[in-house]
């Protein structure tokens, strides 16, 4: 069982959100009205930091205000999901940089993605974020 990163928990708490792991089919969902992020308890078996950061991305960008747009087309849903993924990567890069002493040139996309269980289809986004980091 993996624990949630304490820096990430601080961000969740500072934003006034609750984080609840429960038995559910989807990986995670953010409910703005209740200020709660629900995550599948199956995520506790591995590092769940990416999923938490992804849901924080929806919160930060106030995607709940765009629910009609989100549900309008597959394209609009994918666009908002990608935006949440990008924010998740940026949050995790910030945490990574605060936990490990390294030079920018030492950033390794593969190690970073493996550590945080970031889906491989986001590799180009991770690499771009690393280039723009700092």
Task: Give the predicted meaning of each segment.
Residues 1-134:
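Active-site hotspot residues in diverse enzymes, especially metal/ion-binding acidic/histidine motifs
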């Amino acid at each position: 069982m993996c624990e949630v990163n304490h820096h990430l928990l601080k961000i969740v708490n500072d934003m006034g959100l609750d984080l609840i792991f429960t038995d559910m089919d989807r990986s995670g969902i953010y409910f703005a009205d209740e200020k709660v992020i629900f995550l599948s308890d199956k995520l506790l078996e591995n590092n769940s930091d990416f999923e938490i950061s992804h849901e924080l991305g929806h919160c930060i960008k106030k995607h709940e205000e765009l629910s009609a747009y989100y549900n309008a087309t597959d394209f609009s849903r994918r666009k908002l999901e990608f935006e949440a993924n990008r924010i998740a990567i940026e949050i995790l890069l910030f945490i990574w940089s605060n936990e490990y002493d390294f030079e920018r040139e030492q950033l390794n996309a593969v190690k970073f993605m493996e550590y945080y269980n970031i889906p491989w289809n986001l590799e180009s986004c991770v690499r771009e974020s690393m280039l723009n980091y700092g």
